[in-house]
From Swiss-Prot:
Residues 1-21 are annotated as: Disordered. Coiled coil: none annotated. SUPFAM superfamilies: WD40 repeat-like. InterPro entries: WD40/YVTN_repeat-like_dom_sf, WD40_repeat_dom_sf, WD40_rpt. Pfam families: WD40. GO terms for cellular component: actin cortical patch; cell division site; cell tip; cortical actin cytoskeleton; cytosol; nucleus. It comes from Schizosaccharomyces pombe (strain 972 / ATCC 24843). The keyword Repeat applies. This is Uncharacterized WD repeat-containing protein C9G1.05. It comes from the Eukaryota. PROSITE patterns: WD_REPEATS_2, WD_REPEATS_REGION. WD repeats lie at residues 56-95, 100-143, 144-184, 187-226, 229-268, 313-352, 356-393, 433-472, 477-516, 520-559, 564-594.
Length: 595
C-alpha cells in the first residue's frame, strides 16, 4: 500500500485590512510567489493548478521574492527571519537563514547579481538590514527611518542603488555597495506603502496613503514628476516589463495604468466586488495580476483592462468539506466563513452567491441537491448546488452553538452543545436535551439510525421513529472525548475517532468492537471518510498526518506524513484510488492511493 501527492490546490495570498500585499514574479514571467499563512506558494501563471508549497517557516510568512537568476527564493516572516532556498530543484534545499531584524519582515529585494538582499520591516533595533545571500554578512546599513519600513526596491544594474518606503512619510535613498544612506525624499504627506524600480533601472516610483505617485531618477534620486493618482490609499505599484508603463492598485477598488514617460492615465479598471486592491504585479506584457483584500487573484489584460480570469481560494484554515454525489464538485468552508465550490476536473474554485456564515463553518453535509452548513454564528444554512448559491430564506437559528448535522430519512438531525434537534423543512419537529456535551454526529446510510459522540468519551446510538428520538445503545470503549464519527457506506461498520488520535472500529449492528488498535495518530482526529467499498478508512488529524486503515488487515496502514503543515482537517474519497484532503494551511491536496 502506498500514496503519492498528485497536486495541490493552493491557498490565496494572506492579506490584512488596509495593508499592502507583496507578490513576486520570476524574470521570465512564468511564476508568481506569495505568502500564505506559514507557507510560501510558488504558482505557475498559465497553469494555476501547478504549484509548490514551501512549509519550512515557523512563523506566519509575509513576503517572498525570486532572485533575478530564477534559481532561488528569499522569503521573510513575522519573526524577522529571511530564508534563502533553492526553487529550481525538487528538494528545495535551504541555502541560508538570516535574522534580518527583530520583528516582522514587510518586504525584501535582491540585487542584480543575485548575491545581496535588503530586508526591511518592523524591527526594534533597526528597520532594515543589507546582507549577502550565501553567508549573511552585512553589506551596508539601512537607517534613517523613524517608523516601520513598508517596502524596499534595489537597482539591478550598476551603479547599485536602493530605495525604502516608510510609515514616517519618507523615502530613503541609498548608494551601494556597501549600501550607505544618501538622502531622504520627503514628498509624501502620509504613509508610503510601496516603492519600485523599473526593469530598465532608469526610474523608480513610490506610492502611499496620500493617493499620490512620485517618480524619481533611478541613479540620482531626483524627482521627475508627481501624479495625483487615486482618492484613497495606494497599496501597490508595479512596472510593465518594458518599463514604458506602471500600474497602481488602491483602497478605492480601482487599478490604474499610467504612461511612465508623461505620467498620464492610460486606462482604469474598477473592481466589481468592492474589495480593496492591496497588491499587484505585472509579469508579462499581456498580463497584470491584482490581489484584493480577500486574497483573490484577478488576471487583467493591460490593453483593455478586461478580466481574463479570477483565482479564488481560502486564506484561513479549512474547517469543513463535503463531496457532491457524482464526485465532480468539492465544497469547502473555512474559519472566516468563506465557502467555495471546487470543480474537481478543472481544479478550480468558484464562489457561492448569497449570504454565507459570518465566522467559522463547523460542518457541511450533502442532502439531496443541497449542501447543509452549520456555523459558529449559530445558524444552519442551505446551499442550492444547482444554482450555486445560498438559499436566501433557508436560514435556521440553532439556538445554541451547533456541533454537527446529519441527514436521516427526510429529516435533519442538528446537534448543539446542549440538545439534539430534529428538523423537517427547516422546522423543528422535536428536541431532546442532553445530559452530556455532544461533540460529533453521524447517520447510518441505510437505516433510521444515527449516533452522537460526547465529551464524556461515550457514543450514543439513536433511532428516529415518527420524528421522535429514541436512544437504543451506548458504546463506551473510547478513553478520550469523541471528535469524529463515520458509518461505512454498506452500513456494516462505525468508526469512532477521539481527541487522543485513536480510532475504534465497531460492528454497526452488534455494536461490538472489531479493533481498537488504530492508534497511530498523535493528535485529535478531525476528519474521517470511508471508501465506496467500505474496505478502507481515511483519517485526518491535528498531528498533520493522514492515515488510511484497512478493515481486513487492521495493522496495515498508509501514512501520509506532514500532509498539511498546520494540521489535516478533512478527507474525502473521490474514487477508489484518489483522495482529497484539506488542512489548516488553507490548502487542498489530491492524493493517489495504491492498495
Amino acid at each position: 500500500m502506498s500514496s503519492q501527492l498528485k497536486s495541490t490546490w493552493a491557498p490565496v495570498p494572506s492579506t490584512k485590512p488596509s495593508q499592502p500585499c507583496k507578490i513576486g514574479t520570476d524574470f521570465k514571467g512564468e511564476r508568481i510567489v506569495y505568502p500564505a499563512n506559514k507557507a510560501i506558494i510558488i504558482r505557475e501563471i498559465e497553469k494555476q493548478e501547478n504549484c509548490f508549497q514551501y512549509n519550512e517557516h515557523t512563523a506566519p510568512t509575509t513576503v517572498a521574492r525570486f532572485s533575478p537568476s530564477g534559481y532561488y527564493v528569499a522569503s521573510g516572516d513575522n519573526q524577522g527571519n529571511v530564508r534563502i532556498w533553492d526553487c529550481a530543484g525538487e528538494d528545495k534545499i535551504l541555502k541560508n537563514q538570516v535574522t534580518a531584524i527583530s520583528g516582522r519582515i514587510t518586504d525584501l529585494d535582491w540585487d542584480g547579481d543575485s548575491q545581496r538582499i535588503i530586508a526591511v520591516g518592523e524591527g526594534k533595533e533597526r528597520y532594515g538590514h543589507a546582507f549577502t545571500a550565501d553567508s549573511g554578512n552585512s553589506v551596508g546599513e539601512i537607517f534613517g527611518h523613524s517608523s516601520v519600513v513598508n517596502a524596499v526596491s534595489l537597482r539591478k544594474s550598476r551603479p547599485f542603488r536602493a530605495a525604502t518606503a516608510s510609515d514616517d512619510n519618507s523615502i530613503n535613498f541609498f548608494h551601494g555597495t556597501p549600501y550607505r544612506f544618501n538622502r531622504s525624499l520627503r514628498v509624501h504627506s502620509k504613509f508610503v506603502y510601496d516603492v519600485r524600480y523599473s526593469p530598465n533601472d532608469e526610474r523608480f516610483a513610490s506610492a502611499g496613503a496620500d493617493g499620490k505617485v512620485y517618480v524619481f531618477d533611478g541613479k540620482t534620486g531626483d524627482q521627475v514628476y508627481e501624479i495625483d493618482a487615486h482618492k484613497g490609499s495606494i497599496f501597490s505599484i508595479s512596472w510593465s516589463p518594458d518599463s514604458s508603463q506602471f500600474v497602481t492598485s488602491s483602497a478605492g477598488y480601482s487599478c490604474k495604468i499610467w504612461d511612465a514617460n508623461t505620467g498620464s492615465l492610460i486606462r482604469e479598471w474598477l473592481s466589481s466586488d468592492k474589495k480593496q486592491l492591496v497588491g499587484t504585479v505585472w509579469p508579462t506584457k499581456d498580463l497584470i495580476i491584482v490581489v484584493n483584500s480577500k486574497g483573490n487573484l484577478t488576471y487583467l489584460n493591460p490593453s483593455d483592462c478586461k478580466v481574463i480570469d479570477t483565482i479564488y481560494g481560502h486564506q484561513r484554515s479549512i474547517t469543513a468539506a463535503t463531496l457532491s454525489p457524482d464526485a465532480t464538485h468539492f465544497y469547502t468552508a473555512s474559519y472566516d466563513g468563506t465557502v467555495l465550490s471546487w470543480d474537481i476536473g478543472k481544479q478550480k474554485a468558484f464562489p457561492l452567491v448569497g449570504e454565507s456564515h459570518t465566522n467559522q463553518v463547523m460542518q457541511m453535509i450533502m442532502a439531496d441537491d443541497h449542501v447543509i452548513t452549520i456555523g459558529m454564528d449559530d445558524t444552519l444554512r442551505v446551499i442550492d448546488i444547482k444554482q450555486g448559491c445560498f438559499a436566501k430564506d433557508n436560514v435556521f437559528p440553532t439556538g445554541y452553538q451547533p456541533i454537527g448535522v446529519c441527514s436521516v430519512e427526510d429529516c435533519l438531525i442538528l446537534v448543539t452543545v446542549s440538545d439534539i434537534q430534529v428538523l423537517r423543512s427547516l422546522t423543528g419537529v422535536s428536541t431532546a436535551k442532553t445530559i452530556y456535551q455532544p461533540s460529533a454526529v453521524a447517520s447510518h446510510p441505510l437505516k433510521s439510525e444515527f449516533c452522537v459522540g460526547g465529551e464524556d468519551c461515550c457514543v450514543y446510538i439513536h433511532t428516529l421513529e415518527k420524528g421522535e428520538l429514541c436512544e437504543v445503545a451506548q458504546c463506551k470503549d473510547s478513553t478520550a472525548p469523541i471528535t469524529c464519527l463515520a458509518y461505512s457506506p454498506d452500513g456494516k461498520y462505525l468508526a469512532c475517532g477521539d481527541a487522543s488520535g485513536k480510532v475504534v472500529l465497531y460492528d454497526a449492528n452488534s455494536r461490538e468492537v472489531i479493533t481498537s488498535r488504530w492508534a497511530f495518530h498523535t493528535g485529535r482526529i478531525l476528519g474521517m471518510s470511508w471508501n465506496a467499498k467500505s474496505t478502507h478508512l481515511a483519517t485526518a488529524s491535528l498531528d498533520t498526518n493522514i492515515h488510511i486503515y484497512s478493515v481486513e488487515r487492521p495493522m496495515k496502514y498508509i501514512a501520509m506524513k506532514n500532509a498539511h503543515s498546520l494540521g489535516a482537517t478533512q478527507v474525502e474519497w473521490v474514487s477508489e484510488n484518489e483522495l482529497l484532503s484539506t488542512g489548516s494551511d488553507a490548502a487542498i491536496k489530491v492524493w493517489s492511493v495504491t492498495f
